[in-house]
């Protein structure tokens, strides 16, 4: 029903939003997820479907695709309403305290509370800027769904963050050769990942940037890279390019919703409350002192936000849900 009112609407269907939906089910809250993308999973679904994630407790290693599938299955335990391809552009509090959410296509949703789990917002990858990029559209990759297509090929990765290093390490045992091109010197990645990279077969080109692409019939054969210290150039053989130059993020109209924001997200307290009563934030959407930006931390923040939403609606409710092993939904 279009005018149905939900106890909580979670804006964002990435890993944190999905787990928050599961936890809200434990709290018997009528739940809706609204996501701007065609499918749930957030940046993990888009950027990391075949990459291995290793920083979630109890899961030594899992692909992004499998993590999203597991979280979606878990989220659906209590049958939340999931709406995709809708970006929330306006939130208004009605006279009865209910929030009215309007999406970009004019759809209207109603909710008693809101949990923002949009990560850094909607995103657009930063594209490679180099000569003749337009001649090799099939050789330039910003996300990869099947790494087997690069088996026994020479490939190059451009970037210096965790994502670039993860891709270089993922491709290293599959590709004939992997080149990592980075315009800086000090990688912006986990120390252990950098150590493993330097001990691998990956050829590292620091202080270099991609300048020009070469090939025939739209088949990439070589790239020219330039040293930003000496301006010297060199040619690297490669059949495919992986570009990890970050993303442009857009919080859209959230800046107009009335809550306090800082450089790295929406300001929350230790209960994930924003400065607007009834609106909560978690995951990369939220910021507070000593914030840890990993999935495992967000999976902790989501339930805190849901518990706060529950207490907002029912001040006498229990502070937290019964643990799942004792929950009536999983007994008998």
UniProtKB/Swiss-Prot annotation:
E.C. code: 1.18.1.2
One Pfam family cited in the UniProt record for this chain: Pyr_redox_2
Cofactor binding note of this UniProt entry: Binds 1 FAD per subunit.
Needed co-factor(s): FAD
Residues reported to bind FAD: 35, 43, 48, 88, 123, 284, 325
Disulfide bonds: none
Keyword Manganese attached: no
Protein's UniProt keywords contain Methyltransferase: no
Alphabetized GO MF terms: ferredoxin-NADP+ reductase activity; flavin adenine dinucleotide binding; NADP binding
Enzyme category, top tier: oxidoreductase
InterPro entries, per database record: FAD/NAD-bd_sf, FAD/NAD-binding_dom, Fd--NADP_Rdtase_type_2, Ferredoxin-NADP_redctase_2
Catalysis performed (reactions): 2 reduced [2Fe-2S]-[ferredoxin] + NADP(+) + H(+) = 2 oxidized [2Fe-2S]-[ferredoxin] + NADPH
Keywords: FAD, Flavoprotein, NADP, Oxidoreductase
Family label: Belongs to the ferredoxin--NADP reductase type 2 family.
Subunit record text: Homodimer.
Protein name in the entry: Ferredoxin--NADP reductase 1
Organism of this sequence: Listeria welshimeri serovar 6b (strain ATCC 35897 / DSM 20650 / CCUG 15529 / CIP 8149 / NCTC 11857 / SLCC 5334 / V8)
